[in-house]
From Swiss-Prot:
This is RNA polymerase sigma factor RpoD. Disulfide bonds: none annotated. Residues 462-532 are annotated as: Sigma-70 factor domain-2. CDD domains: Sigma70_r4. One of its GO terms (cellular component) is cytoplasm. Residues 630-683 are annotated as: Sigma-70 factor domain-4. It comes from Coxiella burnetii (strain RSA 493 / Nine Mile phase I). The gene is rpoD.
């Protein structure tokens, strides 16, 4: 007796039908892009259900018929109407959901997905690039990377293993398919993604902080295998001590397992202070007091002396017994345990790991060069090269052995032998410079990369779980010159700094510590970016204090505070108060619309002091015209003398001697002509025309 199954059940394996053959007719509607086939059932035959499985565009939909239980065969029904036929949309959605499930299950097992497989599975409705980006984003969040081509084993070496779970896959399918219908508003998308992460308890914060610490210690333990880095670190410490530099540039502190985990005194007071000071403090509210002052010099000196002692023993053991000797490994382990307790500054940490990466890049560059000559140019099989070359990077006899193994390509290998030997010599030189062989360089970098990845994942979890804290603090700083999204972005930067410097052993909750860093980042960004004209941070603090006292006076008296009152309250000279009030004014755009119709700008009403006013221009024009008219009543000689003497219609005036040379007479004669012309102009008939201009000038 066959078991009862739903009519829409789908089988993922091919099954042969038993009993009577079912008549199946498939009719595809052109509007359906998933290429699923509908089923029409014959009236006299048992009902059957078709199942379609879509693998790719190249494979046709496969139809499998399956007989229904006998209870369904007793009452053959009439041919179904259009309304009774299966809904194509529902079948397409179900098939699409199941197809996604199979794809995600396979992708989670492999850890990646190929872009072509994703496109083949999606219907044509998902051809929009924005929708495709959204789906790829959701897959990335699930831990599934999308590649253009299948990655090699090295790319997946550090990836975490993923486990397939039916319920989890079904949830992931729903999330991916829902991506298309979600909003594209960035704020809503950010809020939705932020809300999907659960808040952390105190215990959860400690667990993540320990994971961060474990990853950092793993990196520090790997660094010890490269002795030159330890020696360089010791030299930098000696330089800082000799020059009285800042220890915080080198160290933040030390990981101490025995450090007290008791709660600090009155953390509630600090929380309250953080909340009350959010409103008015505009400076570096969360200053760099957390982790920036550096460790205690005496404690640091003790740790460094111990480090120097262990490093000296390790170097002596290498010289006496060699790197692989048990005694040397014992000293190396002790050195690694001590050095892993050092909490380096971010700059110093990146400097040490950066040197290791540069070594690896140099080695990889030479290896790729050798592989290019052997595989690409000499046409030797890639698998043979990968099997033969490792552990023979600097073996100068390897090429001869490789030619014997590949006799068909021996001539081509001989052609590029000089280049291959040169690359091997470069690798040997790299080993000699760093006292490490190529395999050791790769192993150190592998351990460093794993430790960094572990620490980075834990930091990401801590940051995502505390994004709500940034929102709550950023809300208090709106309408201060920066948009809300910019405030969130700056607050998130402060949150990331807080995660880097958080010390769970002090007993504080992370939110108590991070609040100061978030506030500091937001207020600093407001001071730097909000104003068109940047004002120093200390002046911003003075302005905020002035505004706060001004509001208090207004609430107490109901009258705006005068500069004298503000000066008395702030113990500040009145002149400085006026200067601060002047600086506090915000610039206004000259393009600001004015009036109800907004048909004019503010710049149209601002006086241009460099331009002559219309009244002065009209007066000057009238005076010039009247002067020319009066001069026309004189003789040409007298008029020209006056014009030259007073610079009328000329660039400049002239002396008596200059005018005399012009007329070829003495300067005394020019003075007489000038005096006679001026007496004529003083006549009332002529002077009357100039009286009005004299009154205006007065």
């Amino acid at each position: 007796m066959p078991s009862r199954k739903k009519k829409s059940s789908v089988t993922k394996t091919k099954k042969k039908t038993t009993g009577k053959k079912a008549r199946v007719t498939a009719k595809a509607k052109p509007s359906v892009k998933s290429k699923l086939k509908t089923v029409k059932r014959a009236p006299a035959k048992p009902k059957s259900v078709t199942v379609a499985k879509t693998k790719s565009k190249k494979e046709k939909a496969k139809v499998v018929s399956q007989p229904l239980p006998k209870t369904a065969e007793k009452k053959p029904s009439a041919p179904p109407s259009e309304t009774q036929q299966p809904k194509i949309g529902e079948n397409a959605a179900e098939s699409q959901r199941l197809g996604f499930g199979a794809l995600l299950e396979e992708a989670k097992n492999k850890g990646y997905l190929v872009h072509e497989d994703l496109i083949n599975l999606l219907p044509n409705d998902y051809a929009d690039p924005s929708q495709m980006e959204g789906i790829i984003g959701r897959l990335t969040e699930m831990g599934i990377k999308v590649f253009e081509i299948p990655p090699d084993a090295d790319s997946l070496l550090l990836e975490e293993d993923t486990q397939s779970d039916d319920d989890e896959i079904n949830e992931d399918v729903a999330e991916v398919l829902a991506t298309e219908t979600r909003t594209t508003d960035p704020v809503r998308m950010y809020m939705r993604e932020m809300g999907s992460v659960e808040l952390l308890t105190r215990e959860g914060e400690i667990v993540i902080a320990k994971r961060i610490e474990e990853g950092i210690r793993q990196v520090m333990g790997a660094v010890v295998q490269y002795p030159e880095l330890i020696e360089k670190f010791i030299k930098e410490y000696d330089t800082i001590v000799a020059t009285e530099g800042r220890l915080s540039d080198l160290l933040i502190g030390f990981f101490d397992e025995e450090e007290s985990t008791a709660s600090p005194v009155a953390p509630e007071a600090r929380d309250k202070e953080a909340e009350t000071s959010d409103e008015d403090d505009g400076g570096e509210g969360g200053s760099d007091e957390f982790g920036e002052s550096g460790p205690d010099p005496l404690i640091t000196q003790q740790h460094m002396e111990e480090l120097k002692k262990l490093y000296g023993r390790y170097q002596n053991a290498i010289k006496r017994y060699g790197k692989k000797a048990p005694a040397t490994l014992k000293h190396q382990k002790a050195l690694a345990e001590l050095f892993s307790t050092f909490k380096l500054s971010i700059k110093q940490f990146n400097r040490l790991t950066g040197q290791l990466r540069r070594m690896l890049r140099a080695a990889r560059a030479q290896e790729r060069l050798i592989m290019s000559y052997c595989v690409v140019k000499a046409k030797t099989p890639r698998k043979k090269f990968i099997a033969s070359f490792p552990h023979n990077e600097t073996n100068m006899k390897w090429l001869e052995q490789y030619k014997n193994e590949n006799k068909e390509q021996a001539k081509r290998l001989e052609k590029y032998s000089k280049e291959i030997y040169r690359a091997q010599r470069n690798l040997a030189q790299l080993e000699e410079q760093n006292n490490l062989n190529i395999q050791e360089i790769k192993e150190i970098n592998r351990r460093v990369a794993i430790g960094e990845a572990k620490s980075r994942r834990a930091k990401k979890e801590m940051i995502e779980a505390n994004l709500r804290l940034v929102i709550s603090i950023a809300k208090k700083y709106t309408n201060r010159g920066l948009q809300f999204l910019d405030l969130i972005q700056e607050g998130n930067i402060g949150l990331m700094k807080a995660v880097d410097k958080f010390e769970y052993r002090r007993g504080y909750k992370f939110s108590t510590y991070a609040t100061w860093w978030i506030r500091q980042a937001i207020t600093r960004s407001i001071a730097d970016q909000a104003r068109t004209i940047r004002i120093p941070v200390h002046m911003i603090e003075t302005i905020n204090k002035l505004n706060r006292i001004s509001r208090q006076i207004l609430q107490e008296t109901g009258i705006e505070a005068t500069p004298e009152e503000l000066g008395r309250r702030m113990d500040m000279p009145e002149e400085k108060v006026r200067k601060v009030l002047k600086i506090a004014k915000e610039p206004i755009s000259m393009e600001t619309p004015i009036g109800e119709d907004e048909d004019s700008n503010l710049g149209d009403f601002i006086e241009d002091i460099n331009m002559e006013s219309p009244v002065d221009f009209a007066t000057s024009a009238g005076l010039m015209e009247a002067t020319r008219e009066i001069l026309s009543t004189l003789t040409p000689r007298e008029a020209k003398v006056l014009r030259m003497r007073f610079g009328i219609d000329m660039n400049t005036d002239h002396t008596l001697e200059e005018v005399g040379k012009q007329f070829d007479v003495t300067r005394e004669r020019i003075r007489q002509i000038e005096a006679k012309a001026l007496r004529k102009l003083r006549h009332p008939s002529r002077a009357e025309k100039l009286h009005s201009f004299i009154e205006v000038e007065e």
